[in-house]
């Protein structure tokens, strides 16, 4: 984050604010981890709300503060009232308003200052402040830098747990090429804040309910190979979803 952006951010938060945090539709661990980390960072001195465009996988309910996430599809009236009061909107882990689905029009019509933090390539020019770096492993790693640039001393176990979870999820437990020496250093610093590495791994990867295992079985059973290419693809049919009581996020991590 360059000095001009840092100065703009510090000026914005020089007084109490009404902050809205928005992840992308069907948010994953990186999106929700980013939202919750910023929620905990600003919540003591500001009014802060997280509004998800829709439902997210219940696997992520272990994240500290997840009980405070509002679902726009379930509670439109309450969410729209919050939008009317908001003066700062963070959009996290997406670079195009279309990824916010049913919230995109509310964001574009709002008079609030919009801050994008995202690690995907080619961001749209919708935000007042754009913090974008496609070389970063995850949005959570960027959020860590964002928080450190304002007040690193405020990072506690809750913030560290949320950020670490997002980084681990988006890097495949530090296996993917996006993992850098800096990513590992950030992970180390988060562990120093008491992050329970084993518990997070278990929650993310060994938390399969019976119906989700059956859904995975259906996905494997539907494998198709493209002849002449080292490519295999699959599909999950409407019937598979109905039989296995499918909910958004149940297929998270099946394909990478």
Enumerate the language-model features and the residues they cover.
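Short alpha-helices
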Residues: 117-186
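Hydrophobic helix-and-loop "lid/oligomerization" segment in the mid-to-C-terminal part
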Residues: 2-25, 31-73, 77-88, 169-256
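Solvent-exposed alpha-helices and their adjacent loops that cap or buttress functional pockets
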Residues: 13, 81-84, 106-109, 123-124, ...
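Active-site cofactor/cluster-binding pocket
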Residues: 69-129
């Amino acid at each position: 984050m360059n000095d001009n952006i840092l100065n703009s951010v510090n000026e914005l938060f020089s007084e109490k604010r009404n902050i809205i945090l928005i992840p992308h539709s069907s948010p994953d661990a990186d999106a929700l981890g980013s939202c919750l980390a910023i929620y905990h960072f600003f919540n003591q001195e500001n009014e802060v709300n997280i509004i998800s465009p829709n439902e997210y996988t219940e696997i992520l309910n272990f994240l500290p503060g997840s009980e405070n996430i509002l679902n726009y599809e379930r509670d439109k009236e309450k969410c729209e009232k919050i939008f009317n009061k908001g003066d700062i909107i963070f959009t996290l882990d997406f670079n195009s308003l279309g990824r916010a689905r049913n919230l995109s029009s509310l964001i574009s019509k709002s008079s609030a200052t919009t801050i994008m933090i995202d690690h995907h390539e080619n961001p749209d020019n919708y935000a007042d402040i754009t913090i974008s770096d496609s070389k970063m492993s995850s949005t959570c790693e960027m959020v860590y830098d964002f928080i450190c640039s304002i007040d690193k001393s405020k990072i506690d176990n809750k913030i560290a747990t949320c950020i670490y979870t997002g980084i681990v999820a988006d890097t495949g437990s530090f296996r993917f090429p996006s993992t850098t020496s800096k990513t590992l250093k950030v992970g180390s610093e988060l562990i120093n804040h008491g992050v329970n590495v084993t518990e997070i791994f278990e929650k993310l990867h060994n938390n399969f309910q019976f119906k989700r295992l059956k859904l995975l079985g259906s996905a494997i059973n539907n494998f198709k190979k493209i002849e002449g290419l080292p490519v295999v693809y699959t599909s999950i049919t409407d019937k598979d979803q109905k039989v296995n009581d499918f909910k958004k996020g149940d297929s998270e991590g099946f394909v990478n």
